[in-house]
Amino acid sequence: MPRQRRGLRARPRRHSAPVPWPSNPVSRFSRHYFYFHFTNQPYPEDRKGCYLCFRVERTQGGLSSEVGSGVFENEFYPKEPVHAEICFLNWFKAQPAFQAQRLAPEEKYQVTWFMSWSPCFQCARQVAKFLRDHTSVQLSILAARLYYPRRPQYQQGLRSLQGAGAHVAVMTPADFASCWEMFVDDHKKRFWYWKGIYINSCSLAKSLEDILGNPEN
């Protein structure tokens, strides 16, 4: 399957998933992709990929500067699948500022993820290990939906992220609007809340609260 070139924004057919993007991050994506993949219906059809919108800020000497931002999707072709979280870690570890590894005690990286799905348990373990090994990195994960929230392994994966210092939360309507503003091509167009966005967000947040607050769940 040919790769979609940067700048081309194919509109997905109704009830069909768009073709995957290359592994390199893009700065923004189309509003059609956003509405298709970031709906917070608990179990939507044909949303098998995961989109990760990220922003990285570096704080040094009391001053903050942006290191980078963009959008990753799960990588499927032509190699073995690589989830969006791992694509981000590979990108982040290659950044010159991070590779220098000469961080002063007060120097921090603030990383924010807006994700269409919460991390799977395998990715959660890898991200948690990365955070434990790099205490200068502070991660906030805001997920539109929870991935297999009733399965113990996935629940434990989310708890491992919290235990490693990550802030894990469900996206609120305000978070969806912020993600639209930062990462959607047509962000100047009005963001329309879809039916059920409020109640779905509250329901998913309650489920996540139960998972994170109950180790025996």
Question: What does each model-found stretch correspond to?
Answer:
Residues 1-217:
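Zinc-dependent deaminase catalytic domain
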